[in-house]
């Protein structure tokens, strides 16, 4: 297994798909990385040379991935909660943040129904 950005990349998958195992890299980003490195999308990870893997590592160093990205997201949500804006309050109450209605739906976020006690 090749190790890129602290993540073990599966050997038998195509490079384009294997790079998406890294948090913060989706299919479009992986395609940009491979285009910049000059590697074919259909190449398997096991067929990559050490030089190609190093090229990919160098390109990924410039992108915010894994721990840094998780930390940034966590801090931005915490900032919203600290300034007590609407989005921050919705995060704090575990409700939908992006304007979805929560009168009848939003069961996934709210959790299971609570029984009505008389």
UniProtKB/Swiss-Prot annotation:
Keywords: Ribonucleoprotein, Ribosomal protein, RNA-binding, rRNA-binding, tRNA-binding. GO terms for cellular component: cytosol; small ribosomal subunit. PROSITE patterns: RIBOSOMAL_S13_1 (PS00646), RIBOSOMAL_S13_2 (PS50159). GO terms for biological process: translation. Residues 94-118 are annotated as: Disordered. Part of the 30S ribosomal subunit. Forms a loose heterodimer with protein S19. Forms two bridges to the 50S subunit in the 70S ribosome. SUPFAM superfamilies: S13-like H2TH domain. This is Small ribosomal subunit protein uS13. GO terms for molecular function: rRNA binding; structural constituent of ribosome; tRNA binding. It comes from the Bacteria. Belongs to the universal ribosomal protein uS13 family. InterPro entries: Rbsml_uS13_C, Ribosomal_uS13, Ribosomal_uS13-like_H2TH, Ribosomal_uS13_bac-type, Ribosomal_uS13_CS. The keyword Secreted does not apply. Located at the top of the head of the 30S subunit, it contacts several helices of the 16S rRNA. In the 70S ribosome it contacts the 23S rRNA (bridge B1a) and protein L5 of the 50S subunit (bridge B1b), connecting the 2 subunits; these bridges are implicated in subunit movement. Contacts the tRNAs in the A and P-sites. The gene is rpsM. Pfam families: Ribosomal_S13.
């Amino acid at each position: 297994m090749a190790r890129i950005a602290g993540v073990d990349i599966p050997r038998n998958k195509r490079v384009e798909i294997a790079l998406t195992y890294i948090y913060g890299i989706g299919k479009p980003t992986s395609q940009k990385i491979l285009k910049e490195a000059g590697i074919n999308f259909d190449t398997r990870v096991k067929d990559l040379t050490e030089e190609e893997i190093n090229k990919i590592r160098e390109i990924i160093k410039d992108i915010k991935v894994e721990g840094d990205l998780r930390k940034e997201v966590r801090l931005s949500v915490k900032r919203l909660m600290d300034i007590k804006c609407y989005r921050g309050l919705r995060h704090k109450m575990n409700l939908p943040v992006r304007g979805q209605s929560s009168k009848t739906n939003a069961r996934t976020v709210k959790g299971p129904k609570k029984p009505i006690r008389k």
